[in-house]
Amino acid sequence: MAKVDLMEYERALELFEPVLGFEVHVELNTKTKMFCGCANEFGSGANTNTCPTCLGLPGGLPHVNEKAIESSIRLGLALGCDIAESSRFARKNYFYPDLAKNFQTSQYDEPIAHDGRVSIELENGRELTIEIERAHMEEDAGKLTHIGGATGRIQGADHSLVDFNRGGVPLVEIVTKMIEGAETDAPEVGRTYVRAIRDIVKALGVSNARMEEGNVRCDANVSLRRRGSSELGTRTETKNVNSLRSIERAVRYEIQRQAAILEAGGAIVQETRHWHEDTGSTSAGRPKSDADDYRYFPEPDLVPVAPSREWIEELRGTLPEPPAARRKRLTAEWGFTALEFQDVANADLLDELEATIAAGAAPAAARKWWTGEIARVANAQGVAAGTLVAPEHVAELAGLVEAGTLTDRLARQVLEGVIAGEGRPQEVVDARGLAVVSDDGALVAAIDEALAAQPDVLAKIRDGKVQAAGAVIGAVMKAMKGQADAARVRELVLERASQ
C-alpha cells in the first residue's frame, strides 16, 4: 500500500471542522433468519444454513420473522425513536458476489423507526446528544473470503469463496444525523457512540453484540469543512469497522488524510474505504453510490409491517434500565472509578456483580473475583463466567476471606471446588479441610521449629534485618500447607525472634 501523507491532527483541527456520521449494523440474535426458516448461527460449516429463499433460487418466497420485528421495535424504542405505524420493505439492487439474489431486502423511505437520540459522555466529562435519523430492518449479506493477493481484498485475489450462512440474517441499521461540533473529540465521539449502541443492544438482549464476530459493525462517515465556511465537504465512508479502538483510529486517520489532501489543493473522492488494522490506515474501495443508484422499489413479496399501538406499548414495558442511567447509578453506589466500571461492563458481568453485591459482598471484592479468577477460568474453558458459579456463592466466598477463614490462595482452591460442583464454599472448606489455621499455639510451634533449623536467619533478624524473616515465614507456610495467615505468621516470627 502506497504511503499517504497525513497532516498533524492538531493542525488539521485548526484548519477544518470534522463532520461525522455513523451507520451501525446490529445483527439480531433470532433463532432463524429474517425471511426464511434457516438457522441463524455463527460458526456453522460453510453454506450449511441455506435454503432456496436465502439463496435467491426460483420459487423461494420470503416470510417475515416476527421475532425480528419485535426486536427491531424494542431497539427503536430504546433509542428514543418514534415507531412507524406502517413500514415497508424495499429491494436495494446492486451486484456483489456475496449477494445471492442480486438485491438486498432492506427498507428505504419507510423505516420501522425514526427520529431518536442517544446521549454519550466523553472521558473529559463532556456530554453530547447524537441524533438518530432512522433505524431500519434489512438482511445481511454473505461472507466472502478472498484467496491470494496481498491485501486480502477482492482486488488482486486469485479467487474468492462465499459462505451464504450469514446471508439473510436479520439486521437493524442505525443511521445518525449529521454530527457537528465534535471538534478535537471526533475520534472519541465515534468510539463512545458505538460503545453506547453496543451497550444498549446488550442490555435489550436483541443481539449477542460481539464485535469480533461481526454482530455489531460500523460504517464511519467523515468529511471536513474549512473553518469559516458553511459549505460541507465531500464525505468518505469507511466500511465495516468492527472494534471500538479501530473506529477511533479510523476517524482520526481520515481527518488527517483528508486535511492533507485539501490543504495541498486536492479534492476528496466520494467513496467507500477499507480500514486496515495492521497499518492503521484506510484505502480506497469503490465510488460511493447515492440512493438512486440502488434503484429502490417496494418489495412485492412482502406486505407492510403495521404494529399496533397496543403491541408497541407492551414492548415499551419490557425495556430494561438504560445502560447510561445504570452506569451512573451503579458507579455511585459501588464507588468505582469510570475505568473500574468499564472493566466490568466490557466483561459483560454487570448482572453478576450486582447480584453478588446484593447477596452481601463488598463491591471491591465482588469485582476482584468476577474480573479476576472467575474470568480466568471462564476464558480457559471457553464459557461465560456467569455459567460457572452463582453470585450468592461468590458473595459467600468473599465473606469467608473477609472473616479471615480463608486466604486468597485457599479461596481460589475453594472456588475450584465450587465450580467442580462440590457444594457451597463453606461445604468445600469443610470437605477439603481448607480453613486457615487460627490457633496461635500451632503456629508458634511451627515457627520455633523453623527458627531452630535456621539459626543464621534468627541472628540476622535479631540484628535488625527483618527482611530475613521471609525464609522462616516461607518454611512455616509450607509446614502449614498454606493454611495460615502470612501476616499473622510474620507478626509471630518477629515476636519469637525478639525473645
Curated annotation (Swiss-Prot):
Q: Which GO MF terms does the UniProt record name?
A: asparaginyl-tRNA synthase (glutamine-hydrolyzing) activity; ATP binding; glutaminyl-tRNA synthase (glutamine-hydrolyzing) activity
Catalytic activity, as annotated: L-glutamyl-tRNA(Gln) + L-glutamine + ATP + H2O = L-glutaminyl-tRNA(Gln) + L-glutamate + ADP + phosphate + H(+); L-aspartyl-tRNA(Asn) + L-glutamine + ATP + H2O = L-asparaginyl-tRNA(Asn) + L-glutamate + ADP + phosphate + 2 H(+)
Signal peptide per UniProt: none
Q: What does this protein do?
A: Allows the formation of correctly charged Asn-tRNA(Asn) or Gln-tRNA(Gln) through the transamidation of misacylated Asp-tRNA(Asn) or Glu-tRNA(Gln) in organisms which lack either or both of asparaginyl-tRNA or glutaminyl-tRNA synthetases. The reaction takes place in the presence of glutamine and ATP through an activated phospho-Asp-tRNA(Asn) or phospho-Glu-tRNA(Gln).
- Self-association state and partner proteins as the record states: Heterotrimer of A, B and C subunits.
Keyword set includes Nucleotide-binding? yes
Per the UniProt record, which EC number(s) apply here?
6.3.5.-
Task: Give the family per the record.
Answer: Belongs to the GatB/GatE family. GatB subfamily.
Question: What is this protein called in UniProt?
Answer: Aspartyl/glutamyl-tRNA(Asn/Gln) amidotransferase subunit B
One GO biological process term is: glutaminyl-tRNAGln biosynthesis via transamidation
InterPro entries reported in the protein's UniProt record: Asn/Gln-tRNA_amidoTrfase_suB/E, Asn/Gln-tRNA_Trfase_suB/E_cat, Asn/Gln_amidotransferase, Asn/Gln_tRNA_amidoTrase-B-like, GatB, GatB_Yqey_C_2, Gln_synth/guanido_kin_cat_dom
Q: What class of enzyme is it?
A: ligase
Q: Is-annotated flag, keyword Transferase?
A: no
Keywords of the record, alphabetical order, are:
ATP-binding, Ligase, Nucleotide-binding, Protein biosynthesis
Q: Which SMART domains match?
A: GatB_Yqey (SM00845)
